[in-house]
Amino acid sequence: MNYRTLGFTGIKVSEIGLGCEGFVGRGEKFAAELMNAAITAGINCLDLYSPDPDVRSFIGNALHGRRDDFVLQAHLCTVWQGGQYKCTRKMEEIVPSFEDLLARLETDYIDIGMFHYVDSPAAWREIADGAIMKYAQELRKSGRIRSVGLSSHNPKAALAAVESGLIDVLMFSVNPCYDLQPGSEDCEKLWADESYSKKLLNMDPEREKLYETCQRRGVGITVMKAFGGGDLLTGDSPAGMALTPVQCLHYALTRPAVAAVMSGVHSLEELKENLAYETAADAE
């Protein structure tokens, strides 16, 4: 496994990490098997956006006794209500959810605390100028989070956050098809068929500027949607042909400032396919 430094944070992460989607609805036995297999392979980082109490508890149990060897990127602004995930900007919901996160993970700190799903410049301004940012800074000062980050699908919002100097890490959707698309506050457009009805040949300049700015300012990028939610791996891929996991991983990991791809694997076989990147020949 190759390891990279996450921007100026000094945090070393495996270039292949885990997303949390594959843990949802699978039970504690599967969570333990997946975490054990990942750790054995050298994976040392995980993105946890889900507020699902079972997922949080299962991951906490799986990390018992080895928490300090693992990098947790976990999200503020997500809550569990009525058995459903919800994105929120209400402090009366954010604070209890964060306390629940720490308790279920059996830890007293999160390595990277992420502002969740910030897909418009207005949403970023609301966070940057308000109580949520103050809360994150208080958590950082007390050591309960070590670095501050943000997740986004929109290069405009992400660039505003990066240029503000208020975040250390950006989680962004990176793959060879999304990178052709202009920024939008509606992330659904990234995977809508009509967005690819016309042939697009060049990287969107706003995305290119975002990656270069992250590199220059030392903001590390962790990647989501490297496989486009699986769409890029099928014959109906907007790329015009099915790409392989290795090709998608290689694309993401060769963008400026990218340190790790957080892959939401749903099986041990999918994990194995991703890990094949570490030993793949250049021709693959």
Predicted stretch roles:
Residues 1-74, 141:
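N-terminal binding-site loop/beta-alpha segment at the start of enzyme catalytic domains
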Residues 6, 18, 46, 59, ...:
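Conserved, mostly hydrophobic/aromatic
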Residues 11-16, 42-44, 66-71, 106-111, ...:
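Short, well-ordered coil/turn segments that N-cap beta-strands
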Residues 16-29, 79-95, 121-125, 233-242:
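Active-site mouth loops of central-metabolism enzymes
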Residues 26-38, 89-106, 152-160, 243-251:
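Short, acidic/polar
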Residues 51, 65-95, 115-119:
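Structural motif corresponding to the early beta-alpha repeats
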Residues 100-124:
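Active-site groove signature of glycoside hydrolases
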Residues 118-284:
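Beta/alpha (TIM)-barrel catalytic core signal, keyed to glycine-rich beta->alpha loops juxtaposed to Asp/Glu
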